[in-house]
Amino acid sequence: MSRSPSNPKGTRDFLPSTLSKRNYILDIIKDNFKLFGFLEIETPALEKNSTLLGKYGNEGDSLVFKILNSGDKVKKADVNSLKQNNLSAFIDSISEKGLRYDLTVPLARFVAQHQNELVFPFKRYQIQNVWRADRPQHGRFQEFTQCDADVIGPKSIIQEIELIKLYDAVFSQLGFNDIIFKINHRSILTALANYIGAQNKLNEFISIIDKIDKIGLENVLEEVKKLLNDDSVSKLSTLLIENENSMQTLNDLFGDTSQAKKGIDELTSILEFINDNKCLNNEIKFDITLARGLNYYTGTIIEVVSKSNTAVGSLGGGGRYDNLTSLFNLKNTSGVGISFGLDRIYLEMEEKKMFPDDLDNHFDIVVINFGLNYIKKLYPLIDSLRKKGKKISIYPEKTKLNKQFSYGDKYKATYAILMGENEFNKNEIIIKNMKDGTQSFHSIKEVNSSLF
């Protein structure tokens, strides 16, 4: 018995009703990208493994989808490594390319490759799919769409402020009023690691701290204890529980180190600018536990969460990366960017019924089919109405009226246009209101000139 067809786990098909809602979100994001001066680019779905790997940490690298070589390249497979159970070396021998994990690393490659063709500071936005070999679960997929905005060029906290304001503009326009923009700084995380004795295990420590929203403070402290010792856990616990998110406490603890002072000063300037100008509709706050465990962040870190639904995870995030383009031989070029989690935003809006009611109205008018000659006579009118922006669908065959009206109902058509034999002879049509069932007779000329 044959199995019914299905898509791979962790991926989705999008029905028209779903896609109209996703496009509603995307249109608002795109419009705001343009309002803030960003230009659109695209990069290939495939990147060289040498471009992708080594940029996301060990956990991130393990989630890159690798693509098997084809043709004669398969003959280069390192069979000895496979026999010795060295799977990493074996996979490297049969794969030179992978699916992009995010849009930021491909951007760094793009900027380095096309630097002589770009104007700096270069503000780009990009909306494309990315792939991660993650365990599929609610709000987490193996294929999903990222919507990124980045600035490459001279470093200034104005860029961070503008990106936070961009976030706020989009989420406000989408109807969110319970958003928190969390910010932290990589140098503060480094100072925190030094303070508890984790300076030699910085990446491991940041990876643990980054899990606090998923596994809770108690479990984070337990993992830190395994990594370090009881004294380290005591220091971290005291700081997080008793003086949580106090910039003054951080200044007292770390302010005498130039590295920590840089981060504290930058975040203080960002918060003061935003609070003094009262330019956000949503809340912004400093969060010392915000880590976003990606190895390429070097400065400010940003994350977007909903107060009322933390289960879905972050709705967006980003930060500053000063060294990423240097991996592609473009030195001394800073970057900062943010990403919108389209799929999670969609889930949140769907759960809260935040979408406009008319998004399911796939066309305005359904034309009832009484035969080809009738459609032929109606076609100049149909063509004229389409030029005026009306969305019109002609039922493709002459069949029972109930079936044709049902078709219009299911696609939320507002009106139906009918032309039977009597109307044909009189150059008239019937317009039926699909909402209340009322109908009226009109000349074709009248409809064309004013009715719609």
Which role does the model predict for each range below?
Residues 1-22, 76, 83-92:
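Auxiliary tRNA-acceptor-end handling modules of aminoacyl-tRNA synthetases
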Residues 21-36, 47-48, 83-94, 102-116, ...:
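Positively charged, Gly/Ser-enriched RNA/tRNA-binding surfaces
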Residues 39-45:
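A short beta-strand-loop structural module common to alpha/beta enzyme folds
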Residues 45-97:
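Polyanion/phosphate-binding surface patch
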Residues 62-75, 198-219, 306:
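Acidic, His- and aromatic-enriched active-site or binding-groove loops in soluble protein domains
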Residues 141-147, 183-191:
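Short, conserved phosphate-binding/catalytic loop or strand-edge motifs used
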Residues 178-188, 205, 284-289:
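Short, surface-exposed recognition loops or helix-turn segments adjacent to catalytic cores
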Residues 182-183, 205-210, 392-401:
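A generic structural motif
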